[in-house]
């Protein structure tokens, strides 16, 4: 098992243990995940795919992740990472090998860079701002989604609990 997948499994446990400050959808089946990857033109890294299958979309202690989900109002349209990635490509010229996974709160997107796959099949986590084409100037937040998301959520839960 990879480091990113182990971290994603720990994040699933963290969300389940803190259900009073977490929300999530029902999760995505294999067909929905495949449709999302097809629309984006690339596969999700394993650590992100695991969380999408488990939760679809989720938030915990104020940290919100796009994930992949559908609503009755929007029908079969895939929302979350799919809709936001396609919108950023169309409206802002986001490179086609990036996948949006969350908003950074300052006008940018936290993205997975599929052009830099590691030996475990994971993509690094970067911040992309509209208009930025140079990868070297993008802030790197982590080596894989699972480790990045678990660390972020663990800190958020600790801060939340300490403020009670």
Q: Where do the PLM segments sit?
A:
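A short alpha->loop->secondary-structure connector
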Residues: 116-122
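A surface-exposed partner-binding patch
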Residues: 1-109, 117, 159-164
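Compact, glycine/acidic-enriched structural inserts
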Residues: 127-133, 137-149
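Acidic, proline/glycine-rich low-complexity IDRs
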Residues: 143-164
């Amino acid at each position: 098992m990879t480091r990113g997948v182990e971290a994603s499994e720990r994040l699933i446990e963290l969300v389940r243990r803190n259900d009073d400050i977490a929300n999530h959808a029902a999760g995505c089946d294999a067909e929905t995940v495949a449709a999302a990857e097809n629309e984006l033109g690339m596969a999700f890294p394993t650590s992100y795919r695991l969380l999408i299958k488990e939760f679809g979309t989720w938030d915990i202690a104020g940290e919100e992740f796009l994930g992949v989900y559908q609503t009755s109002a929007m029908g079969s349209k895939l929302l979350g990472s799919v809709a936001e990635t396609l919108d950023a490509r169309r409206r802002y010229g986001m490179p086609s090998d990036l996948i949006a996974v969350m908003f950074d709160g300052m006008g940018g997107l936290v993205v997975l860079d599929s052009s830099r796959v590691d030996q475990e099949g994971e993509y690094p986590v970067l911040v992309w701002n509209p208009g930025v084409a140079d990868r070297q100037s993008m802030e790197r937040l982590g080596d894989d989604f699972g480790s990045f998301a678990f660390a972020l959520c663990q800190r958020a839960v600790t801060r939340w609990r300490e403020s009670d």
